[in-house]
Amino acid sequence: MSTKLDTILENPQYAILCGITVFTLFIVQLSLFDRGRNYPLLNPKGSFEISTNRVVREFISDSRNLLEKGKSLFKGQPYRANTDWGEVVVIPPQFLDALKSHKDLDFTIPAQDDSHCYIPGFEPFDADPNLSKVVIKYLTKALNRVTGPLSEEASIAFRTVISDSPEWHEIQPQPAFVRIISRMSSRVFMGEELCRNEEWVKLAGDYTVQSFKTGDELRMYPRWSRPFVHHFLPSCKEVRRTLNAARNCLNPLLERRNAIKAEAKAKGEPCPYDNSFEWFEKEYSTHDPAVAQLNLSLVAIHTTTDLLMETVFNIAQHPELLAPLREEIVRVLSTEGLKKTALLNLKLMDSVLKESQRLRPALLGSFRRLAMADVTLPNGDVIKKGTKIVCSTSHMWSADSHESGEEFDGYRFLRMREKEETEQGKTSHPHLVSPSSDHLGFGFGNHACPGRFFAANELKIALCHMLLKYDWKLAKDAVPRSASFGMILMPDLRTKLLIRRRSEELDIDSVES
């Protein structure tokens, strides 16, 4: 008997299946307690099905088409859907302006739950409000003085990761860009010494990739089963190992850092450091430095790498953009230097980035909120307390929101910007960092991404280096295809780039910052 039990426990998939089967027998049909029962359900479970596991898995594998179906069926009215984020009420985008600052709609609780921060190893996904405070209070205010360090680190990272070879060579863009953005972000967050610690850079990049991939795997299981399932999943164990390795990597570095700070204090000298280690110490009474740094890295690395990759793909498919983008960089940086204000004047680049994000935002569902009390919608309907709402992002590429909405147009938001500048009082939100109900790439409302200003600067600096120093094209004339996985809209990870060093028109490494 014990031998059979040992065999079961040694087989993770069998153990998981048994566990789910046992627990499912005790699950009461959740539909009896639906908080949004007055809305039609897009993908109901079968009459004899105990759980929604099948329909959720179908949603995960075909979410983009299902959300388009919901949009077509319910025509601007709220509806329910069984998703990898649980049962949600999908609200139409025309409701967003009225709800964007609603005090009873909370982002933190559903974000924490959907990111599995209750599972050991996923602590860096904790949507702590103090993180937003750190970003707004320290990082955003430091933008002007970090452009130089960001550019310096970008130069080293591109040379290390992409190489200076003038010959065409093939790269896998996702891991390459993860390393580059990790280095750039860590330069600001952790300082020059630590950002060049290859062990830390690798661990931060590995944790980002592993945790998001494992999170996707966990969403294949019912929410109630995940606190049990994670014990058996090798990927969850790997996430925990990487987090512990990150802690072990930082400990000796922090000890040396603290000794230097203590020595400076004893001499009556100011603290020699001004980066996120100090920011967190000022804002938190107690915190785990590795978790805090990985929290910042998750926010900075994943979404920034994602948008950089998509933009590089789009430029490769529209090579006519290369010359005007390079001309803009040379004109702006040669006259204004590498400053925050100069980056704001890279208007075509800003438009290309925003257009890339419009056509493939990181999520198929934005404005994720939990009703903390009954909330009245603009049409008079009442969302009951405890209901999770979300807005599909499919309208971002719809002709209802944008002319020729399904086509890439790198000049789209530049034209809007120029029109806005000539028409006083008109606001079309053409800037990359300006969220609107028509463009949810950085979220919307009170909980729009607080790090978007830093991300925009980091992206522009990375693109300045790449455009000036490299030629690139898609390998084997590939056409990148995004893929949906539940509420996540992923880039094409199979597409490779051919890239080579070129002679730049402007030596960006010599531009004054």
Swiss-Prot record:
Q: In which pathway does it act?
A: Mycotoxin biosynthesis
Q: Which cofactor does it need?
A: heme
Q: How does it sit in the membrane?
A: Single-pass membrane protein
Subcellular location(s) per record: Membrane
| Presence of keyword Transmembrane | yes
Q: Does the keyword Transmembrane apply?
A: yes
Under Gene3D superfamilies, the record lists: Cytochrome P450
Instruction: Name the source's superkingdom.
Output: Eukaryota
GO cellular component assignments: membrane
| Residues at which heme binds | C449
In the UniProt record, which residues carry a glycan?
Answer: N130, N295
For the protein in the UniProt heading, the enzyme class is oxidoreductase
Membrane-spanning intervals of the chain: 13-32
What are the EC numbers? 1.-.-.-
Gene Ontology biological-process annotations: secondary metabolic process
Q: Which key words are in the record?
A: Glycoprotein, Heme, Iron, Membrane, Metal-binding, Monooxygenase, Oxidoreductase, Transmembrane, Transmembrane helix
Q: Could you give a GO molecular-function term held by this entry?
A: iron ion binding
Describe the task this protein carries out. Answer: Cytochrome P450 monooxygenase; part of the gene cluster that mediates the biosynthesis of equisetin, a trans-fused decalin-containing tetramic acid with antimicrobial activity. The PKS module of eqxS together with the enoylreductase eqxC catalyze the formation of the polyketide unit which is then conjugated to L-serine by the condensation domain of the eqxS NRPS module. Activity of the Dieckmann cyclase domain (RED) results in release of the Dieckmann product intermediate.
Family classification: Belongs to the cytochrome P450 family.
Protein name, please?
Answer: Cytochrome P450 monooxygenase eqxH
Which gene underlies this protein? eqxH
